[in-house]
Amino acid sequence: MAIATLAGGCFWCLVKPFTSYDGVKSITSGYSGGTVEYPTYEEVCTNTTGHVEAVQIVFDEQVISFSDILDIYFKTFDPTDKNGQFFDRGESYRPVIFYHDEAQKESALKKIDALNEAKIFDKPVVTPVEPYKNFYPAEDYHQDYYKKHPVHYYQYQRGSGRKAVSYTHLTLPTSELV
């Protein structure tokens, strides 16, 4: 099994896109990259912990590759915005790919280069690729939010602008690029 740790705005919206893929074993919402141990949601929202809202995905590399995980990831948010996502602004909502080994780092950098070269987006992809430091699972009420609160989840996606972008911002599958 392998692990991918990815941030792209509100973690509620990063879970569901991965659930329908074979080889994805678990998806946990949490906080990653900061200096405060075991932060709470309230602490992370102050933008003083260094953490971002992220998901940690456990996957079977024999079934789905890290590159495939990145293909799904880049269809879920705006990678040209480094200051948050949609109406969620600030440090805790910035996108980040946290790599767990050099192969993940290389794959992420190649994927970003390919997206930029293909000019998939109107602006350059600015999603940073950073070494993995830590991950703290979020409070239980944040886990599988789309299942626990489907009406609110849907309203949040539509109201934030994320739903429209997740369907339209890629004009061809990123898997064709790398």
Please describe what each predicted stretch is.
Residues H169-V178:
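Single conserved hydrophobic/aromatic residue that forms the stacking wall/gate
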